[in-house]
Amino acid sequence: MLNKLSRLLADAGISLTDHQKTLLVAYVDMLHKWNKAYNLTSVRDPNEMLVRHILDSIVVAPYLQGQRFIDVGTGPGLPGIPLAIVLPDAHFTLLDSLGKRVRFLRQVQHELKLENITPVQSRVEAYPSEPPFDGVISRAFASLNDMVSWCHQLPGEKGRFYALKGHLPGDEIASLPDDFSVESVEKLRVPQLEGERHLVIIKSNKV
């Protein structure tokens, strides 16, 4: 699997250390193992996980600005854990309301010795915003409107929302509240992944 990951990374133009690659493969191994009992993802094949979970997460890394991020509705740690592995100087709070997912995240944290993640079991609306985050990240979590409404308290003054989407959600962009606007839309290239992928970056218009 390490060889396949190396080929995918080369195809995507992403350079990682051998240690980072080893951690990513170890995470996939754990996800595959725990998935049989905990049903953490509909993707069953570890090789498919490399594309649909690992590559699909880390292609976002170049667009993130700041040091403190929160991954809302992280599920089994996506995209937060792959991003934490490739961005070791940043910190990621991994938020999910389901206990079985958070137990898995804590086990990943322990086994992979990831010191830059904090798994938290909480609903996003109930999570405190102090200190504020540089970025709020979601992947298939909610509509853009719901994301900014439920998470409005989390980013700092210059913080951003980073929403990973499939096709460009024009209707969701059009229905954003007036307090928020789209700063940019980045088309993402994920080797061997069918369909479009976009990153929508949103900022607050409040002064």
From Swiss-Prot:
Q: Its catalytic activity? A: guanosine(527) in 16S rRNA + S-adenosyl-L-methionine = N(7)-methylguanosine(527) in 16S rRNA + S-adenosyl-L-homocysteine
Gene3D superfamilies in UniProt: Vaccinia Virus protein VP39
The protein's enzyme class: transferase
- The EC number of this protein is 2.1.1.170
Name any GO cellular component annotation: cytosol
Q: Name one Pfam family in it.
A: GidB
Domain of life, per the record?
Bacteria
Annotated binding of S-adenosyl-L-methionine, by residue: 73, 78, 124-125, 139
Instruction: Could you list this entry's UniProt keywords, alphabetically sorted.
Output: Cytoplasm, Methyltransferase, rRNA processing, S-adenosyl-L-methionine, Transferase
Its subcellular locations are: Cytoplasm
- The principal localisation class reads cytoplasm
Give the molecular function GO annotations. rRNA (guanine-N7-)-methyltransferase activity
Which family does the record claim for this protein? Belongs to the methyltransferase superfamily. RNA methyltransferase RsmG family.
Q: What does this protein do?
A: Specifically methylates the N7 position of guanine in position 527 of 16S rRNA.
**Protein name per Swiss-Prot or TrEMBL:** Ribosomal RNA small subunit methyltransferase G
Q: Which organism is it from?
A: Salmonella schwarzengrund (strain CVM19633)
